[in-house]
């Protein structure tokens, strides 16, 4: 099994887009990428725009090779309903249920996206289901909260197994801070798990200390069940990310388990462009007329 992160916050843009290849299938999970609308009162720096656009080109390139595409929920850093829709043409597309366990915002986005690919893709609801192709098994969790409650909607987690190899993609659980989000990981015991991590860049605002503490407990439990913990996305928007989960990193070293970020999985440098936005504007000044806003919330 080959696991290839194509875009991530550790690589400079908001995304968890991941390409997984087995002997039987080439799978594209969450083909989307976005930018943080505002950090430190600043819009995305031109270098962030450049990175996002480069990542999107790579996502499209790899998605063309895919036999199967998966959309775990309908935030714009996980799917793109406007561009590159040809990647879905003639493909099997497994999606989060657009009508059940979904909030109003995602319901509208899901409807729009599915109309965009209607007639060109073979769309199936994935929630709680299992699929098999040869020796490759794909299992989906029941919907779990995007975060600590239903305000941001629900996501589905993805487990892929091929023989002795296995990979689990939590999508946006923001931790996981809830037991039912962690349960799917603990039950499946994947060799490699990719987690979006606690949303510590909003600690004390939209993410509580109690949620962080619960996430650390769950991540520690997950370490007992896996060989490699890949943590990225929400956590990697915080320059202090490693301090926030120091106990998890320490445990990983103690029990000889890998705790890494997505960039390390593909031997790329850590480039937290959004978290370093203020620094980017200081190092590479931009005239106000050249600033571009990202107008969409995730």
Swiss-Prot record:
Gene3D superfamilies: Ribonuclease Z/Hydroxyacylglutathione hydrolase-like
Domain of life: Archaea
Stretches assigned to coiled coil: none
GO-annotated molecular function: hydrolase activity
InterPro entries: RibonucZ/Hydroxyglut_hydro, UPF0173_UPF0282_UlaG_hydrolase, UPF0282_hydrls
PANTHER family xrefs: UPF0173 METAL-DEPENDENT HYDROLASE MJ1163-RELATED, UPF0282 PROTEIN MJ1629
Family the UniProt entry places it in: Belongs to the UPF0282 family.
UniProt protein name: UPF0282 protein Kcr_0286
